Amino acid sequence: MLDLQNVNFGYSRHRKILSDVSFSVRAGASVGLVGESGSGKTTLLRLLLGLERPTSGTIRFGDDALDPADGAFMRRYRRAVQPVFQDPYSSLDPRQKVLDIIAEPLQSLRIAGPRKDAVAQALEAVGLPLDAMQRYPHEFSGGQRQRIAIARAIVARPQIILADEAVSALDLSTRIRIVELFKTLSATLTLVFVSHDLGVVASLCEEMVILEKGQVVESGKTRDILTAPQHPYTQRLLASIPRMPA
């Protein structure tokens, strides 16, 4: 579904952020991109969203190369691929009601159909009541706001969710509930989950890609990497990062 081959990215020859990144994401898979701050994982997510263009290398969605300059392709791609960002406090417009926030992709992607019905289905999927439509973000807790952000991501029925540190700004108990929500959604969607927290990825993703200083140092089945990490960087991550309950 997503295939990266020898992807490089940098702002100059002397400031390289990603080096020869190659991996694939199968349809229906849940894949964690794991690395510490500065590993390049958020930059990689920006490339996957089409917000940046690789310096070299290719990102493919199905049979097509991802080209941010191709407007027609990007409209199709953005319908198929939706993001969830880190901070539920800053990612929602406080001036808008929840109905308008969640419905935004329907409008921007020109998706026809009853707007309220689609929003109601998205709210139900994330466990929020229908009366949330007429309320504002400040009326909700952090966990509820992230549920609103997830509802916005799924309202257009995408094929892939790209989540960037989507639980790191939440308290532990809320984090566990949102991870469980992502786990439920991943049964019908492809999920790429960016996190510095190996424990979160271990509880959520069946596969993982480990990034260190812009390079893939290890990838494979999550259980295999956790059981027998091969790279010293992965071994250090496994030893130092607290794990969430499975």
What is the predicted role of each segment?
Residues 49:
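Helix-to-loop junction immediately C-terminal to a conserved catalytic motif
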Residues 66-82, 96, 100, 108, ...:
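ABC ATPase NBD coupling module
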Residues 114-131, 238-239:
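Conserved ABC ATPase "signature" region
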Residues 136-140, 144:
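Conserved ABC ATPase signature
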Residues 155-159, 188:
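A short, proline-enriched helix->beta-strand linker immediately N-terminal to the Walker B motif
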Residues 219-220:
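ABC ATPase "signature
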